[in-house]
Each structure stands twice: as C-alpha cells, then as structure tokens.
Design a protein with these regions (language model features):
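Substrate-binding/charge-relay-adjacent region of secreted/lumenal peptidase catalytic domains
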Residues: 32-294, 338-406, 411, 422-431, ...
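Secretory targeting and sorting signals
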Residues: 4-34
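Polar, glycine-rich mid-to-C-terminal structural blocks
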Residues: 294-340
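N-terminal start and proteolytic maturation junction detector
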Residues: 22-25, 324, 348
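An often Trp-containing, charged/polar helix-loop segment at the C-terminal end
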Residues: 354, 422-475
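Membrane-interface anchoring segments and C-terminal beta-barrel signals
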Residues: 2-6, 448-449
Length: 498
C-alpha cells in the first residue's frame, strides 16, 4: 500500500481547490459496456426534518417538539467513544476522505463554516472566509464535466434529479465526515448527472471514482447512494460497473456504502418518485458488493447533548420503549441477502448467535451506525431558490438546520473512522472486510470492539417481512456499531493478520 506522504504529494499537486475534468479523461479503464437500463439510483438520505432557519443550532426542546432528538458533534463523538483517540492526536490528519455525490453544492464552503462555528470544530482550508495555515485539513472539490449546481436540471417529469435532495446529501456527508475525523482532508467528488440516467448517470459515478483511485486522490471513499440489485437490466450490467472497486482493492483504497433506507426491500427500475418496492426481500448495491463495506443503521438512544449515557426518556418511542438500550435496529435500515453475490469467504465465520448467512448469498450490511432522523444528526444547509421550506413566520426559507437520517449518515462517518485508523496505521488500510470478520470471530475482541445491537428490525416495507436485529451479525446492523477507541487500533492489527 502506498504511504500517506506519497499519496499526499500526488494528491495535493493535482487538487488544490476545485478541479474540473471532462468525462472523456476518465473513461480509460472503464467498463467493457455501458449500463443499458434506466436505473433508479438515488442519494440514500431519505429521512429528514427541517427545524430552524437560524444559524444557531436548534435546542433539544425544538427537536422534541417534532418527535426527534438531535445530535451535535460532541455527542456523536462521545456516543462512539472517540475522545481517547483525539486525546492521542488521532483525528485523521494526513488522510483524505473522498465523498461522491451528484451536482455538489455551491454553498458547501459557506455551510461548512457555519457548521464548524456552531459546534467548535476545527476550520478547514477551503471554507468560506478561512485563511489557510500550515497543517490545516483541506476541503476541496473535484468536478466531473460541467457540473451545474445553481439551477435545477431537466428531470423528465420524474423529479428524481432534484438538486435539493442531493444538496442535503452533500451537506450531510461533508459536515459529518469532518465532525468525526476533524483532522482529515475531504475531497468532494461531483458528477453532473443523477440516478434516472442509467446509461450515463451510473457510469459517471464509477468513472469518477476510478479517476480518484488511479490518481491517488483519496484513501477512503464514502458512497451515500444506492440502487436495488434487481433494478439493473441484467446481472452483467451491474458487474460491468465493479471496475472501480477492483481498482480500489488493488491500490489500497477503502470503499464504503450506505445499505439503503427501505428496510428489507428494494425498488424496481421505474423512473418515478417513490416507486413501489419489489414484492420480495432484496438488497441495495453497491453495499451488497463484497468489495465494499456496507453500512446499516440504528436508532441511537444516547444523550444527544453529551453522548455520555443512555437516555430512555426523550423521543423517539423506539428509545422510550426500550429502557437502558443504547441502540435499536432502525426499521428502514437496508439489509438482507444478495441475489447477485454468493457468501464471501470473510463471512464464513460469524460471532456466536448470529443470523445465518446462506452459502448462496452475501449478507448485507457488514457494520452499523446511527441512521434514523428520529435520533438524527444536525446538518446546516443553504439551498437558494428552494421553496419547500416555510419558516415559523410563514415566509419561505432558503437556509437552516435539519435533523437528518438515513444510512447515508453512517457511510461518511464510517469513512471518517477509517481515516483515523489509516492515520494510526501510518497509511491506508485498504480492503477491510476480512479484518472486520476476523475481529467478529474472536469473542473477546468482538465484545470489546463492537456495540452489539440486538433489538429492533428492518420491516418497513410491508408486506415484505423484515429481519430482526440479533446477537452477533444480523441483516439490520451487521456486526454492530463501533467502540472506536478500542476498535480502530484493533482493526489495524486485524488488517495485518494479528
């Protein structure tokens, strides 16, 4: 694996602020044929609530008034025990997190500054109004083709290419990757098309990823987008897009993906809003790919102000009805068993009591994290021209705080965790799935490294039955959620075979 210093020299010589590259430059090494179907491919953020138009974050009382608890950065860091790592200087510095989204956001540099001011996080070189200094983490953008982020693109009547939802996804991904790994660099990778353009939009994502991987621009990549495996015209159409993941494994880049937000079901390739799920259990790709680490989801029932203790008294009901339980499996967390990929070797040995993974199917997800917006993270966004938000005084709002959920909340935060592990390692860890299950196969290590989520289910898509969260691995939260201070150093050891 390439060392951090080598990657850094190449990376920042190539990317300083915002780079625009045409599609033709990244087509080399692409798939042997294009996807030929219209694939419903969308941001995994689907669970959100607008709270306030102020630049000041909302109070817990404001959040509780709409049945939510809203996590700030400190509370989330404490909930997953990151403090001891920060205390030893491990915050992701020297590592770059790649975040892939459609369209990008013209206001991200401004919104990131507001977010960091609100929560006392370190500022990044590349933020609006911030003077760059030695050793500061960098926020930058890599734009594929002509990315137009100011106006709405044509949507062919479907509404699926709306910039507003993607802008919220971008803000969630960037702000919360930084919140968890405040020393890491962040590269936002923008593509000019979205999910309804199956022939163009899908390959654009993976051409962009391949460009980033081949040019050593990121050490870990978060993918907060998904499509049902059956949404492709053929299995071969899906397999033709795996070239970026194969390159990532060869070059030591960790790939993560949200497992989806429709529970144990997935949706067909119909270019309409909110298509009816398939009438059978199904999973979302790329989280179902064995070369990718899939991230499932939970309700997080810790104190949203401090994260230091379980809070069973505040909303939502899932926390109130499970007293003393720190996390409950999220009802909409994507998970189940692949119809494309057989069980990989790394899933042959699971913790005792796990849900059985059949030999014919890869189990999804691998790991879990907070996901429901009922116990969501606070995201600040400016959305010029959006008329869907009404301020308390009745006027139309264009900026403010949301509480946001979805498994796309977990993917960038897990990418941030891996950035910290990369720093501990002295360079990128690369493909981590075998190491995750190596830890899971050792009862003592597993008990120390993971919070095992054993309550809840992902049965949100009736009549498709959901799966329960169980002891060990399950199709809702995978192996569980991370006790970061113990898990990340142990992950480094496991990657090296220890």
């Amino acid at each position: 694996m390439a060392g951090t210093s080598t990657r850094s020299v190449i990376r920042w010589a190539a990317v300083v602020a915002a780079v625009i590259f045409p599609v033709v430059l990244i087509g080399v090494g692409g798939p042997p044929q294009a996807v030929t179907s219209v694939v419903t491919f969308h941001p995994a953020v689907s669970d959100f609530q607008f709270i306030t138009a102020s630049e000041t974050p909302p109070t817990q009382a404001q959040c509780a008034s709409v049945g939510r608890r809203c996590f700030n950065a400190t509370a989330m860091q404490n909930s997953y025990n990151l403090g001891p790592l920060y205390g030893h200087g491990f915050d992701g510095r020297g590592i770059t997190i790649g975040i892939v989204d459609s369209f990008g956001s013209d206001t991200m540099a401004h919104d990131l500054r507001v977010f960091n001011d609100a929560f006392g996080l370190p500022h990044m070189c590349g933020e609006e109004g911030v003077t760059c200094g030695s050793g500061m983490p960098m926020f930058s953008e890599l734009k594929q083709g002509n990315v137009n982020t100011t106006g709405q693109p044509p949507n062919n009547g479907t509404g699926l290419e709306t910039h507003n939802l993607w802008a919220l996804e971008v803000a969630l991904d960037v702000e919360w990757a930084h919140a968890i790994a405040p020393g890491a660099n962040i590269l936002l990778i923008d593509t000019p098309t979205a999910e309804v353009l199956g022939v163009q939009g899908f390959p654009d994502f993976f051409k962009a990823e391949k460009f980033v991987i081949d040019n050593h621009l990121a050490d870990v990549i978060s993918q907060s987008f998904a499509s049902g495996e059956e949404a492709f015209n053929s299995t071969q159409s899906l397999l033709n897009l795996r070239y970026a993941f194969e390159a990532a494994r060869a070059q030591g880049v960790t790939m993560l993906a949200a497992s989806g937000d429709s529970g144990s079901a997935a949706t067909p390739k119909v270019p309409v809003k909110n298509p009816t799920p398939f009438p059978f259990p199904a999973v979302w790709w790329p989280a179902s790919d064995p070369l990718v680490t899939g991230v499932g989801g939970t309700y997080l029932c810790t104190d949203p102000n401090t994260g230091l203790a379980v809070d069973s008294g505040s909303p939502p009901a899932q926390c109130q009805t499970n007293p003393g339980v720190r996390e409950v499996g999220w009802i909409a967390a994507g998970g189940g068993f692949s119809h494309v990929f057989p069980r990989p070797l790394f899933q042959n040995v699971l913790p005792a009591g796990s849900t059985t993974i059949p030999a014919t199917a890869r189990g999804v997800p691998d790991i879990g994290y907070q996901a429901s917006s009922r116990t969501g993270v606070l995201v600040y966004i400016t959305n010029p021209g959006y008329t869907g938000i009404v301020c308390p005084d009745g006027s139309l709002c264009s900026a403010g705080w949301y509480v946001v959920g979805g498994t796309s909340s977990g993917s960038p935060q897990w990418a941030a965790l891996i950035a910290i592990a990369d720093q501990i390692n002295g360079g990128p860890l690369g493909f981590i799935n075998p190491a995750l299950y190596k830890i899971g196969s050792d009862p003592a290590r597993y008990a120390a490294d993971f919070y095992d989520v054993t309550t809840g289910n992902n049965g949100s898509s009736a009549p498709v039955p959901g799966y329960p969260a169980t002891t060990g691995w399950d199709p809702v939260t995978g192996l569980g959620t991370p006790n970061a201070a113990v898990f990340l150093p142990d992950l480094v050891q496991a990657v090296h075979g220890n």
